[in-house]
A protein has these predicted regions:
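Short beta-strand/loop motif that positions the catalytic acidic residue
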Residues: 208-210, 215-217, 221
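Post-His helix in hydrolase/transferase enzymes
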Residues: 252-268
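Membrane-embedded segments
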Residues: 60-137, 141
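Catalytic histidine neighborhood in serine/cysteine hydrolases
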Residues: 230-251
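Primarily recognizes the serine-hydrolase "nucleophile elbow" in alpha/beta-hydrolase
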Residues: 134-189
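Acidic catalytic loop of the alpha/beta-hydrolase fold
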Residues: 219-224, 248-250
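Short alpha-helix in the alpha/beta-hydrolase fold that links the catalytic acid
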Residues: 96, 202, 211, 225-234
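An N-terminal hydrophobic leader/cap segment in hydrolases
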Residues: 7-55
Length: 273
């Protein structure tokens, strides 16, 4: 047997082993909850957080609701559901979302199954079930206008809110530093698409979503490349792309500009006045 045939055989074997390992451990890579741990994070003083638990068939998940500043004239106002990145917890994101409440928007943070104090195991199926339960609870609140529920996801959270948008109506989508889909991300590492267990196909959801979409992405993002953001923008029917000079974990670089852009988008979408 020629030497080159042996080398090809070894290469094929190595690739097969690589694919098997990726298939076996992909959820540990996508959902690195074991590396996060649980240590309480200091929250802003006097923040009126309502904490409660949501039950699904596979998990009991922690959720926090921050009511808006002031009350709408008719007693019902807009609300937002937030989904964090894969290496975060809801308490780490709470403080940075407070400006939404100053805009008159209630904020619901939903933990992923298996993260923090929530039970269960994270997967697209279990996360979607948790967010559907959260949405239904939020839409039933006496102080929430169900026609003005916004979905906001960052990084992996973009997949969570897109999966929710495929099952429940939303007034608008905000996708920050997120991907077109896990299969597209996996292809960078030569992983076959059929081996992806949790595809989070954001591109298909965005393409079919009829409402306004705000895409926020850093031009220098080396974790989820910038072209994912531009592809999502082109696929959406009504989308705005906010391109910032930043990477993945430092986006947005200018908080004041970011919140000005957010407020403008929400006004144009008819969420706030």
């Amino acid at each position: 047997m020629p030497v080159w045939v042996k080398y090809i055989g070894l290469a094929v074997l190595a690739y097969a082993v690589y694919c098997i390992l990726v298939f076996a451990f992909q959820r540990q890579m996508i959902f690195p909850r074991s590396h996060i741990g649980y240590a309480p994070v200091a929250l802003p003083d006097n923040l009126p957080i309502e904490k409660f638990w949501l039950n699904t068939a596979d998990a009991t998940v922690e959720s926090w609701y921050i009511p808006p500043t002031g009350s709408p004239a008719d007693g019902r106002g807009p609300a937002l559901i937030f989904a964090h990145g894969n290496a975060e917890r809801i308490d780490a994101s709470t403080g940075e979302l407070v400006p939404f409440t100053a805009l008159g928007i209630g904020v619901l943070l939903v933990e992923y199954p298996g993260y923090g104090q929530s039970t269960g195991t994270p997967s697209q199926k279990s996360i979607t079930a948790a967010f559907v339960a959260a949405y239904d609870m939020l839409a039933a609140r006496h102080d929430v206008d169900p026609s003005k529920i916004v979905l906001y996801g960052r990084s992996l959270g973009g997949g969570a809110v897109c999966a929710l948008a495929a099952k429940r109506s939303a007034a608008a989508l905000i996708l920050a530093s997120t991907f077109t889909g896990i299969r597209a991300m996996a292809s960078r590492y030569l992983v076959p698409a059929f081996m992806v267990r949790d595809p989070f196909d954001n591109l298909t959801v965005v393409r079919e979503f009829s409402g306004p979409v705000l895409i926020v992405h850093g031009r220098h993002d080396d974790i989820i490349p910038f072209h994912h953001g531009t592809t999502l923008q082109k696929a959406a029917r009504h989308a705005i792309l906010l391109a910032y000079d930043c990477g993945h974990n430092d986006c947005p670089p200018d908080a004041e500009r970011f919140w000005r852009d957010i407020a403008n988008f929400l006004r144009e979408a008819g969420i706030i006045v």
